């Protein structure tokens, strides 16, 4: 017992603690003030200024399209940061549940399933973190270095800040650039760590379903007196042991359902904003492709639209895998030697089957089911919006 499952989230929570959205159990007064100030200045105020800037933009469609692409990304990061702050108790309850007695095991095969889920979680974090940091470095820090060395004109990495008068642009260039750089970097870290945290808790949920599947297929292995006659003491002992095992499986299944319910409650708003903004971002990227631009900008757009598509597709993919694994529970139940067991065992077995007939699902905003069907619908809506914009543009 005591197998630690949540240590794969140590790096996620450490970075989120630095960013002010995941305090320790008893945070100091300094950290509380730091957290509120940092989140307000570089997340809330950042999006407010970005929104206000649309009023001052030149009346050019391609400029609006460019600004909207990053705007939806920043709104998504804001929703993730605020959700982690206000729904922190649910996230903590979820982590406590992973460390509860119900989800612990000493079986070597079951430990390997959990270890595999943890390794997968860290693998996705490393890939996402590496790509995001590289892209952020090219977008934010490389232009500044080139500006210092070769005196190339420095442009803001995210938002134009068109509300700054021309006579004051030189004065506010470096402070505004620094502010945008810190803001977009923190948003990148919010996105990376919260997105991969969601994938990690889903991987562990699927690992628990795999463990439950394995237990159900072997639930009658506790019966050692297979040839004992009906009504004998040995037969009664075997039936009693089998009933105890199936009851443990029912409790385990209930715990997995409760755990997935906590995932939905903690990430419902995040998923809703992710899917809504994802559709808008893909639409605006497609729309921007129809306008003239430099080659390097088209390369950037291509990479960006691929990343945004994956950001929506990956959780949908594993949401479908979660549904499939929970649906397989009903087949695992009948793979055990249940026919010679007592009536009470069969009654409990039927109860578990009735519960498992409704697969475990996760929804975003009580609207978007986390599945590949939802991903297809999002892509279809993105193209529909794009076609509508093209129709308006050509008139």
Identify the residue ranges that each predicted region occupies.
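Short amphipathic alpha-helical coupling elements at transmembrane boundaries
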Residues: 93-103, 211-214, 218, 248-262, ...
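Inner-leaflet juxtamembrane helices
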Residues: 80-98, 199, 206, 312-336
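Short intracellular "coupling" helices and adjacent cytoplasmic loop segments at the cytosolic face
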Residues: 81-86, 215-226, 235-243, 266, ...
């Amino acid at each position: 017992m005591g197998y630690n499952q949540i240590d794969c989230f140590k790096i996620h929570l450490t970075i989120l603690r630095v960013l002010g959205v995941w305090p320790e159990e008893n945070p100091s007064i300094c950290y509380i003030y730091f957290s509120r100030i940092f989140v307000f200045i570089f997340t809330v105020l950042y999006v407010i200024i970005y929104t206000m800037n649309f009023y001052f933009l030149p009346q050019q469609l391609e400029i609006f399209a460019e600004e909207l692409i990053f705007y939806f990304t920043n709104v998504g990061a804001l929703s993730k940061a605020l959700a982690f702050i206000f729904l922190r108790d649910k996230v903590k309850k979820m982590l406590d549940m992973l460390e509860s007695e119900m989800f612990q095991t000493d079986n070597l095969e079951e430990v390997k399933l959990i270890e595999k889920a943890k390794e997968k979680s860290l693998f996705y974090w490393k890939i996402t973190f590496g790509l995001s940091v590289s892209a952020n470095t090219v977008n934010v820090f490389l232009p500044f270095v080139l500006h210092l060395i070769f005196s190339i004109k420095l442009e803001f990495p995210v938002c134009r800040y068109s509300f700054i008068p021309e006579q004051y642009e030189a004065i506010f260039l470096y402070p505004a650039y620094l502010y945008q750089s810190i803001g977009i970097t923190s948003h990148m870290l919010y996105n990376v760590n919260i997105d991969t945290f969601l994938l990690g808790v889903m991987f562990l949920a699927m690992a628990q379903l795999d463990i439950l599947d394995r237990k159900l297929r072997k639930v009658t292995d506790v019966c050692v007196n297979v040839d004992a006659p009906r009504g004998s003491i040995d037969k009664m002992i075997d039936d009693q042991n089998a009933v105890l095992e199936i009851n443990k499986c029912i409790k385990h299944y209930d715990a997995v359902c409760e755990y997935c319910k906590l995932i939905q409650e903690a990430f419902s708003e995040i998923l809703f904003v992710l899917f809504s903004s994802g559709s808008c971002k893909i639409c605006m990227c497609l729309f921007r492709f129809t306008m003239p631009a430099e080659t390097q900008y088209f390369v950037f757009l291509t990479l960006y639209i691929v990343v945004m598509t994956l950001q929506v597709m990956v959780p949908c993919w594993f949401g479908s895998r979660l549904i499939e694994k929970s649906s397989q529970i009903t087949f695992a139940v009948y793979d055990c030697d249940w026919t010679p067991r007592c009536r009470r065992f069969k009654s409990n077995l039927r109860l578990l089957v009735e519960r498992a007939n409704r697969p475990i699902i996760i929804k975003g905003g009580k609207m978007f089911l986390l599945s590949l069907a939802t991903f297809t619908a999002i892509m279809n809506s993105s193209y529909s919006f794009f076609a509508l914009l093209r129709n308006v543009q050509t008139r």
